[in-house]
Amino acid sequence: MTRWARVSTTYNKRPLPATSWEDMKKGSFEGTSQNLPKRKQLEANRLSLKNDAPQAKHKKNKKKKEYLNEDVNGFMEYLRQNSQMVHNGQIIATDSEEVREEIAVALKKDSRREGRRLKRQAAKKNAMVCFHCRKPGHGIADCPAALENQDMGTGICYRCGSTEHEITKCKAKVDPALGEFPFAKCFVCGEMGHLSRSCPDNPKGLYADGGGCKLCGSVEHLKKDCPESQNSERMVTVGRWAKGMSADYEEILDVPKPQKPKTKIPKVVNF
């Protein structure tokens, strides 16, 4: 058996060196320009010049022409012509007398409402009485005499002395020997440790015009802060179990008020 030596095809398919873009452009235009007519040859030359131009240069943006009329598509004129207002199912033009009257009435009501609001603010401010100088029109936080006096301690927490929060938001625990409010100064006696409402020299306490708590009669707190009402609400009373009582028995705490029987009046018919 005879064997023939053959050259493998893998050695024939070797990669050639890469062609540069300039050689490719020259070769493509030279090969195609010979077979093309003159007109197409000129177009090919123009394309080659455009491609060779540097890409960094951009065309300058042309300035837009200024419009003489701002209403380009006529939309503003359309709105002016069709400006109408629907009132009670009837179409009324916005420049009619009825619409003008309604606008005037609405503005008048608005001005009156604003005037009443300012009057309420002025009345509330005049009713406020300063605890330090006893003058109306401002509170102790805005009192000029209290701000000048550094011993008053305005703008601080009366319980812990912090300037970052008020006494209503304070959660600090204080020694009872120092008093309820160690950093507070009484307006009546001028001593530290208590407020004017709990001062022994102030018989009226929290009620400057007289009176007291409606539940216990104290002058040191309001009715909403009365300890008796808070204790009575928290107390829970449990009834006793009697012999023969049902397991589903529920005690009714609120006793219904007895209703008065209505007396029927005889109806008289006159002919």
Curated annotation (Swiss-Prot):
Its main location: nucleus. The keyword Chaperone does not apply. The keyword Lipid biosynthesis does not apply. The modification Phosphoserine is found at residue 48. It is found in: Nucleus, Nucleolus; Nucleus. Keywords: Metal-binding, Nucleus, Phosphoprotein, Repeat, Transcription, Zinc, Zinc-finger. GO terms for cellular component: nucleolus; nucleoplasm. It comes from the Eukaryota. A zinc finger (CCHC-type) spans 128-145, 155-172, 184-201, 211-228. It holds the Pfam family zf-CCHC. This is Zinc finger CCHC domain-containing protein 9. It comes from Homo sapiens (Human). The gene is ZCCHC9.
